[in-house]
A protein has these predicted regions:
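Long, internal low-complexity/basic segments
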Residues: 1-4, 178-229
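A long, amphipathic alpha-helix that forms part
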Residues: 1-40, 101, 197
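Active-site rim elements
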Residues: 2-16, 79-88, 102-109, 174-182
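Beta-strand elements within well-structured catalytic alpha/beta cores of enzymes
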Residues: 17-20, 24, 41-46, 72-73, ...
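Histidine-centered active-site microenvironments of extracellular/periplasmic hydrolases
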Residues: 29-83, 90
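Structural helix-adjacent loops and short alpha-helical linkers that scaffold large soluble proteins
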Residues: 32-36, 106-107, 185-186
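Non-catalytic, surface-exposed connector residues within folded enzymatic/regulatory domains
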Residues: 39, 88, 109-112, 189
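C-terminal cap/loop subdomain of S1 sulfatases and analogous C-terminal strand-loop tails that border
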Residues: 48-54, 80, 92-95, 100-168, ...
Length: 229
């Protein structure tokens, strides 16, 4: 992509952000006019970020902060004002959060669902040992992508490749891969063990690829899909 097209793409993205911001503002104004703003809990989030040309990448599909990090803002009577929570959290935490706010009980089949109420997390001190997981298995990708956040550290593992480890606090742009530094060997091993205590990357990747192959076969094969566009 040449520089002129890149500028147009960035402008379009920022324009969409402004459009979203404007519409959120309209919603908040309406809530205030209806005199229900103070009693309303609002959760603002996104499903993924945007690489926006950084590292020569566009879209999502990676575990770098540009793609994997999202806004998560909660306003409501159950949450303190002007507070930033540094403990790593994930969208999986939204389900128990909503149930907690509404004082609802989980149905039996979902009693052991992952996640923790963000209200509880926000009211606790910074938990540097809390782990959150993200994974990606896009059809056609070279392998499954797995990411573990624990405190300030991020561990990225693409199946079949060497891991990447970043200290997000001191290296927010993720330029220094600590996995390449022998002095961080114990940290890398600890994060790898933490990831594998949650999930088996190789077996999950194999299962995802098997399902994708079956789906392709069911619709006529990869050539049929590519020719259809």
């Amino acid at each position: 992509m040449d520089e002129e097209k890149r500028k147009i793409a960035v402008q379009a993205y920022y324009g969409m952000c402004s459009f979203m911001d404007s519409n959120v503002g309209k919603l908040l104004t309406e809530l205030k006019q209806c005199d229900i703003y103070d009693d309303t809990t609002i959760i603002y989030a996104s499903d993924h970020g945007e690489s926006l040309g950084n590292r020569g990448l566009w879209g999502k599909m990676t575990m770098y902060e540009d793609s994997a990090s999202i806004p998560l803002i909660i306003k409501g009577p159950n949450f303190k004002k002007n507070q930033m929570c540094k403990t790593p959290v994930t969208l999986i935490d939204l389900y128990p959060t909503i149930f907690d706010i509404l004082s609802l009980d989980h149905v039996a089949s979902e009693a052991n669902i992952d996640g923790e109420s963000l209200r509880a997390i926000a009211n606790k001190t910074y938990d540097k040992n809390r782990c959150v997981l993200s994974e990606y298995h896009g059809a056609g990708s070279y392998g499954g992508a797995f990411m573990l956040r624990m405190g300030d550290y991020k561990y990225i593992y693409y199946v079949g490749h060497q891991p990447e480890v970043f200290d997000i606090k001191s290296d927010p742009n993720e330029k220094r891969n600590l996995a390449n530094d022998p002095s961080f060997r114990s940290l890398v091993d600890m994060l790898d063990n933490a990831l594998r205590s949650i999930i088996n990357p190789e077996s999950v990747d194999e299962a995802a690829r098997s399902d994708q192959k079956k789906m392709l076969k069911d619709v006529g094969g990869i050539d049929f899909v590519l020719n259809r566009g």
